[in-house]
């Protein structure tokens, strides 16, 4: 018996759905059974994000970092919230790490502490907005 597990992710739900359809079509060609499980909702870049503006400003103040914005597949778990509340303003940030989803995956604990402290400052600043 061969089992293949995939977790399709995309910032665009239609692309994620298209990939799932391709996988199901390919499986059908070989008469494989396909079971669809949980779906991670995507969320697209919001050019008018007030939360991102605050985050950018606070990262500069706290860490003297000029943020570089980039889209990745990481952090899409927050899309679960976006799937339920599409008008929600969402950002993702986190500690340093490497080797995601591999046996070599690790988390930099000092960076984790810094990000936890930063999160507390960010939430405090958010309540003043």
At which residue positions do the language-model features occur?
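Hydrophobic alpha-helix feature that most strongly marks membrane-spanning transmembrane helices
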Residues: 28, 60, 83-86, 124-127
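Flexible, glycine/charged-enriched surface loops at secondary-structure junctions
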Residues: 29-37, 65-70, 128-129
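A short beta-alpha structural unit
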Residues: 4-12, 32-52, 73, 77-79
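Short amphipathic alpha-helices in soluble, non-transmembrane regions
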Residues: 18-27
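Zn-dependent metallopeptidase/amidohydrolase metal-coordination segment
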Residues: 66-122
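N-terminal/domain-start segments enriched in small and hydrophobic, helix-friendly residues
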Residues: 15, 19, 40-71, 112-118, ...
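C-terminal domain-closing interface element
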Residues: 5, 9, 16, 123-129
């Amino acid at each position: 018996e061969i089992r293949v597990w995939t977790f399709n992710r995309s910032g665009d739900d239609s692309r994620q759905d298209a990939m799932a359809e391709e996988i199901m079509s390919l499986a059908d060609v070989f008469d494989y059974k396909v079971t669809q499980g949980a779906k991670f909702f995507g969320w697209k870049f919001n050019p008018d994000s007030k939360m991102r503006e605050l985050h950018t400003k606070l990262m500069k103040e706290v860490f003297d970092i000029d943020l570089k914005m980039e889209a990745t597949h990481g952090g899409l778990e927050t899309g679960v919230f976006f799937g339920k509340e599409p008008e929600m303003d969402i950002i993702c940030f986190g500690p340093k790490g490497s080797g995601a989803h591999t046996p070599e995956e690790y988390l930099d604990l000092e960076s984790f502490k810094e990000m936890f402290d930063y999160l507390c400052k960010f939430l405090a600043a958010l309540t003043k907005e």
